[in-house]
Amino acid sequence: MANLEIIDQKGKSAGNVDLNEEIFGIEPNESVVFDAIIRQRAGKRQGTSAVKNRSAVRGGGKKPWRQKGTGRARQGSIRAPQWRGGGTVFGPTPRSYKMDMPRKARRLAMKSVLSQKVADNDLIILDQLTLEAPKTKELKAILDNANVSGKVLVVSDDKNVQLSGKNLPKVKVVPVNGLNVVDAVDYQKLVLTQDAIKRIEEVLA
């Protein structure tokens, strides 16, 4: 079972915590993580691109010229695909890009990412993370005290913390139920509180 140090908001040691080995100590499955990332990004696609085919383009009801006798190639409509202003063949139509993925696989992907963070020493655990008011400077001080730099993903349900993180470049704050594979992979450091760990273990156990 992984045992990590807990630090307080001033950067001082506040004890240790035992992490669930089945969540924070498994062998990462890169293939499942890749599938989860593709699925999440695909689900965000708007899927509204569309073009008109020959039946949707206005006009073209009359035959341009008679079938025979002109010496030109026969034509039935000025909105056929070969005409300028004609309809498009096999163009995009509105569709959903959402992909299905078994719940077990989605959970395995999240476990793999969390386990990789532990293996790379990129998981920082705070005893708590609360602010009395939205103060960017205070949140930055807490991260500096924890010796956290680079791209940081902070998991917190505190509204003041969420507001404080909006003005910090390379810092993103998400609620516990908003923790996802794409953000966890995109941001190098992951900051969790003890309460967040308990809730994550309840969901993924």
Swiss-Prot record:
Any one GO biological process: translation
Top-level division of the source organism's lineage: Bacteria
Cited InterPro entries: Ribosomal_uL4, Ribosomal_uL4-like, Ribosomal_uL4_dom_sf
GO cellular component, one term: ribonucleoprotein complex
One GO MF term attached to the UniProt entry: rRNA binding
Keyword Cytoplasm attached: no
Region described as Disordered: spans on this chain: 45-97
The UniProt record lists the keyword Ribosomal protein: yes
Residue ranges, compositional bias (Basic residues): 60-71
Function: One of the primary rRNA binding proteins, this protein initially binds near the 5'-end of the 23S rRNA. It is important during the early stages of 50S assembly. It makes multiple contacts with different domains of the 23S rRNA in the assembled 50S subunit and ribosome. Forms part of the polypeptide exit tunnel.
Name recorded for this polypeptide: Large ribosomal subunit protein uL4
Gene this chain is encoded by: rplD
